[in-house]
Design a protein with these regions (language model features):
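N-terminal Rossmann-like dinucleotide-binding module
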Residues: 1-37
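Acyl-group handling in specialized metabolite and lipid biosynthesis
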Residues: 199-212
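An anion-binding loop in the catalytic cleft
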Residues: 211-301
Length: 301
């Protein structure tokens, strides 16, 4: 097996695989330079693979002769991709006797694309899940072999739902390998008529719009929390809302209705419970207000 992945989300799957199977090599995105002091940061999967003593490859572009040759000559039967962050070149997909499987965080054909976890929360879905699918040249359109649904509760945010899904993915990939070893693999085509697309999160989506129903606003805050987050401006400073809930109070859109940060929106209001100033730690409202002044009657933009 060859494994391809990059973020925290991919770690449970790699751990599960390496505990039961031989992982020949791990591919991940190349280390990034952090602006402060130009420190080089390896991806979470890079660090995990080193702990597991699995060789790591991190080409800037997967599409090159060396990587093609390496994968072709590795004699791997399977390449498992979990949030790698690069498109698999078609010539790789055409290597004989090698199957590329992708672990996608939605119940395909719903939420194909880059941000399925965020979009499912933002659209107030009640459930999402994991799909294990065959990779084909057109993104997220390949036939799937397994799916498992995961319920989304009202308190779930991007972080908590990602954690749930990553653990389900790890178990499901082991089940998929059992089927693969027994040669009982059956792929089902996706129904194109049901396909929806989870577009990449745009920076603009992080700006708050108080002219939004409270329920929809909470869904957006949860979907983008903790990163990139939804922020408002107060006295020129950007403040990120990490957690909030619906309040039945009424007020003008963007107006601070009470001293414990209940803010008016299109229909009702939201009460902010956790927030964060740029570059600072996340604080509960009470602690935040002890060091930063926002008072009843202020307008937040």
């Amino acid at each position: 097996i060859i494994f391809m992945g990059t973020p925290e989300f991919s770690i449970p799957a790699l751990r599960a695989l390496s505990s039961k199977h031989e992982v020949l090599s791990v591919y991940t995105q190349s280390p990034k330079k952090k602006s402060r002091g130009q420190k080089i940061i390896k991806s979470p999967i890079h660090l995990e693979a080193e702990k597991l003593k699995i060789p790591v490859r991190f080409p800037d572009k997967l599409k090159n002769e060396d990587e093609y040759k390496f994968i072709k000559e590795s004699n791997a039967k399977l390449v498992i991709v979990v949030a790698y962050g690069q498109i698999i070149p078609t010539e790789f997909l055409n290597i004989k006797n090698l199957i590329f499987l992708n672990v996608h965080a939605s119940l395909l054909p719903k939420w194909r694309g880059a941000a399925p976890i965020q979009r499912s929360i933002m659209e107030m879905e009640k459930e999402t899940g994991i799909s294990i699918m065959k990779i084909v040249p057109k993104l997220d359109t390949g036939p799937y072999m397994m799916q498992k649904s995961v319920s989304i509760n009202e308190k779930d945010n991007h972080f908590s739902l990602s954690k749930k899904l990553s653990e389900v993915a790890a178990k499901l990939i082991l089940d998929a390998l059992l089927i693969f070893e027994k040669k009982e693999i059956v792929f089902k085509d996706q129904d194109e008529k049901l396909a929806t697309y989870a577009q990449k999160i745009d920076k603009k989506e992080s700006e708050i719009d108080w002219n939004t129903p409270a329920k929809k606003l909470i869904a957006k805050i949860n979907g983008l929390s903790p990163y990139p987050g939804v922020w408002f401006k107060h006295n020129g400073k950007r403040i990120k809302i990490i957690e909030a809930e619906i309040s039945e109070k009424q007020g003008k859109m963007g107006e601070v209705i009470t001293d414990d940060l209940v803010i008016g929106c299109q229909d009702k209001a939201i009460k902010i419970n956790l927030l964060q100033k740029e570059g600072k730690t996340i604080l509960k409202t009470k602690s935040f207000l002890a060091g930063y002044k926002i008072v009843k009657g202020d307008m937040l933009i």
